[in-house]
Amino acid sequence: MEQELMRIGVSLPEKLLSRFDEIISQRGYSSRSEGIRDAIRNYIIHYEWMSDVEGERVGVITIVYSHHQRGLVDSLTDIQHEFGSIINSSLHVHLDKDNCLEVVILRGEGKDVRRAAERMMALKGVKHVKLTTTSVGAEL
């Protein structure tokens, strides 16, 4: 059964759209819409995977962000203080004149690790966030 398609509008930075167009062309998509549908499916799968994090976990949150975004550094710091009881370490790297990389290592309940990552993902100026989790090793 074919689903009804809904038309939406999306505003994207030119550079991001250009890179997306290159990738969908290389992958052989028939249209930009097909590439966007695939990207949304992958986003949903990633979200569902993140939601399934239970029990004690070790997590690594990798964040790439613009350090020019007003208030972003303070917001990231505030979130790290809020989750200070589960954050073991963080590393800050200046990637170039515009971008920084933050790596945050956490250990705690999976839901808390996930919440910390989601809070960072939602901040304006954050370009990329990746959460990787693993067992603490006790059940291995």
From Swiss-Prot:
Keywords: DNA-binding, Metal-binding, Nickel, Transcription, Transcription regulation. Pfam families: NikR_C (PF08753), RHH_1 (PF01402). The keyword rRNA-binding does not apply. InterPro entries: Acetolactate_synth/TF_NikR_C, ACT-like_dom_sf, Arc_rbn_hlx_hlx, CopG, CopG/NikR_regulator, Ni_resp_reg_NikR, Ribbon_hlx_hlx, TF_NikR_Ni-bd_C. Binds 1 nickel ion per subunit. It comes from Methanothrix thermoacetophila (strain DSM 6194 / JCM 14653 / NBRC 101360 / PT) (Methanosaeta thermophila). This is Putative nickel-responsive regulator. Gene3D superfamilies: ACT-like. Chain A, domain 2 (3.30.70.1150), Met repressor-like (1.10.1220.10). One of its GO terms (biological process) is response to nickel cation. Ni(2+) binds at residues 81, 92, 94, 100. Belongs to the transcriptional regulatory CopG/NikR family. The keyword Transferase does not apply. GO terms for molecular function: DNA binding; DNA-binding transcription factor activity; nickel cation binding. It comes from the Archaea. Its cofactor is Ni(2+). Transcriptional regulator. SUPFAM superfamilies: ACT-like, Ribbon-helix-helix.
